[in-house]
């Protein structure tokens, strides 16, 4: 937070840009990057939540109220459940939803079979994560009315992971309220992301040696790999467990999901 305050300034309502002293002089002002305040937090049941903030002031207030080990790493751990975190986020004008909702380690669907079991009601959005796309998620009935987001890690130490998934929103002005309104009112024009088959957690695999297994073989082995590692259910199988339909039932508001291959991946195979 101190770094954000040191290097950026609010250029419009809830939107930030670099201060002049931190700008690259070779970049045109017309191409200047803009920032919105977000964080990913881990609750007491190890479910990860994405919060999008309207202001620095809201960040400071919520930071105090969440009372967790806030400085442990880029993903604060909070001694509250999802419902409590959502109530605080909404109290201060934020929007909130589950991060990487299907991954086998720290996601809402790793811990719960229904979103309402976590929040008590539906969240503002659901982040798909790298190992799932709209076609997979729209086989789950309870997600029909929830906007999907495709985001990249902002807490990764590897710069090439920034921006590898992103969203296209229909807004009138670049302000927090317009971004919030586009998400809540389903004015997302497109999701851009990985082919989920490229995702780290797409298939059932050992968490230690990364050997992949069919779910039947994994269950017969009691989810233990011969190497001594734990076998974790893949996102594809977890969605199969949760799904009502064999094929996606896209609601009318669902935007296209456009599969992309990040530049770093293209370079690595050339």
Each model region followed by its residue ranges:
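Short, composition-biased local secondary-structure segments
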Residues: 54-63, 109-112, 191-193
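Domain-core and long-helix interface of multi-subunit machines
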Residues: 67-167, 193, 212
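A metal-dependent hydrolase metal-coordination microenvironment
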Residues: 1-84, 128-142
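Residues at the C-termini of beta-strands that transition into short coil/loop
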Residues: 39, 129, 152, 172-173
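Short loop/turn segments at strand-loop or loop-helix junctions that form parts
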Residues: 40, 53-56, 100-101, 264-268
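Short, functional N-terminal and low-complexity linear motifs
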Residues: 53-56, 105, 145-148, 249-253
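C-terminal functional module detector
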Residues: 18, 22-28, 34-37, 84-92, ...
């Amino acid at each position: 937070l101190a770094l954000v305050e040191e290097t950026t300034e609010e250029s419009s309502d809830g939107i930030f840009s670099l201060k002049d002293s931190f700008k690259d002089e070779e970049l045109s002002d017309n191409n200047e990057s803009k920032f919105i305040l977000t964080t990913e937090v881990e609750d007491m049941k190890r479910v990860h939540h994405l919060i999008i903030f309207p202001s620095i002031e809201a960040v400071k207030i919520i930071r105090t109220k969440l009372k967790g080990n806030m400085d442990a790493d880029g993903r604060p751990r909070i001694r509250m459940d999802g419902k409590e975190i959502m109530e605080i986020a909404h109290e201060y004008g934020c929007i909130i939803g589950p991060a990487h909702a299907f991954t086998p380690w720290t996601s809402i669907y790793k811990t719960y079979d229904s979103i309402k079991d976590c929040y008590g009601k539906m969240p503002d959005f659901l982040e798909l994560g790298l190992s799932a796309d709209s076609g997979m998620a729209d086989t789950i009935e309870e997600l029909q009315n929830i906007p999907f987001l495709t985001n990249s890690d902002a807490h990764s130490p590897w710069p090439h992971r920034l921006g590898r998934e992103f969203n296209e929103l229909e807004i009138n002005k670049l302000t927090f309220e317009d971004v919030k309104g586009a998400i809540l009112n389903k004015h997302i024009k497109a999701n851009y992301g990985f082919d989920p088959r490229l995702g780290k957690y797409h298939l059932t695999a050992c968490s230690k040696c990364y050997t992949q297994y069919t779910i039947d073989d994994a269950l017969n082995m009691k989810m233990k790999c011969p190497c001594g590692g734990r076998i974790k259910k893949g996102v594809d199988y977890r969605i199969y467990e949760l799904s009502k339909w064999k094929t996606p039932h896209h609601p009318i508001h669902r935007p296209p999901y456009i599969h992309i291959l990040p530049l770093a991946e293209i370079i690595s195979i050339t």
